[in-house]
Amino acid sequence: MSRLTIYADSTPDAPLLRTEDPERIAQELSSIGVRFERWSSAVTPSPDDDEATILAAYRPYLNALMGETGAGTADVIRLRPDTPNLPALRQKFLSEHTHTEDEVRFFVHGSGNFILHVDDRVYDAHCTQGDLISVPTGIKHWFDAGETPFVTALRVFTDTTGWVAHYTGDPIADHFPAA
């Protein structure tokens, strides 16, 4: 189930809000410019389906989303316990960073946490199958799918070079493990 936990950035042990209500999650994230939606699809591909099958299953949604955002490409990312170089890959995502384009993800299977650092607040958005999240350009954040991840997600990019992080050097992510 999707969940949002909000903290003051100085108190990782004291949540200010914790909700599993999708409407409240969308409302709270919208207040900081983050888009959150639940998508329902008549077709849910298997976790083992190839990238082309997964992209085809969500093509109507992707076409609409890419038209709205001006995105030029989409792909599928999978994180599993047997993903090559998983510890190094995970560390790339765990460090606070920004992007020069919106980071748009749709969770096909599994779950992961987008943790956003905005002003003096930390927003931990636990996303699950059927969740769409779009983190605007420049918002400081990190991502955690856990030490034994199981996630398949669609990624939408404006820049065809794909995922490029600009690390902030702030160690805040070390103090806010995924809720």
From Swiss-Prot:
GO molecular function: acireductone dioxygenase (Ni2+-requiring) activity; acireductone dioxygenase [iron(II)-requiring] activity; iron ion binding; nickel cation binding
Keywords on record: Amino-acid biosynthesis, Dioxygenase, Iron, Metal-binding, Methionine biosynthesis, Nickel, Oxidoreductase
Keyword Amino-acid biosynthesis carried by entry: yes
Family membership: Belongs to the acireductone dioxygenase (ARD) family.
EC number(s) per entry: 1.13.11.54, 1.13.11.53
Site (May play a role in metal incorporation in vivo): 96
Pathway(s) annotated for this protein in UniProt: Amino-acid biosynthesis; L-methionine biosynthesis via salvage pathway; L-methionine from S-methyl-5-thio-alpha-D-ribose 1-phosphate: step 5/6
Site (Important to generate the dianion): 105
CDD domains linked: cupin_ARD (cd02232)
Cofactor or coenzyme needed: Fe(2+); Ni(2+)
Cofactor comment text: Binds 1 Fe(2+) cation per monomer. Binds 1 nickel ion per monomer.
Pfam families per the UniProt record, alphabetical: ARD (PF03079)
Residue sites binding Fe(2+) per the record: 97, 99, 103, 141
Residues binding Ni(2+): 97, 99, 103, 141
Site residues by UniProt (May play a role in transmitting local conformational changes): 102
Protein name: Acireductone dioxygenase
Coiled-coil parts of chain: none
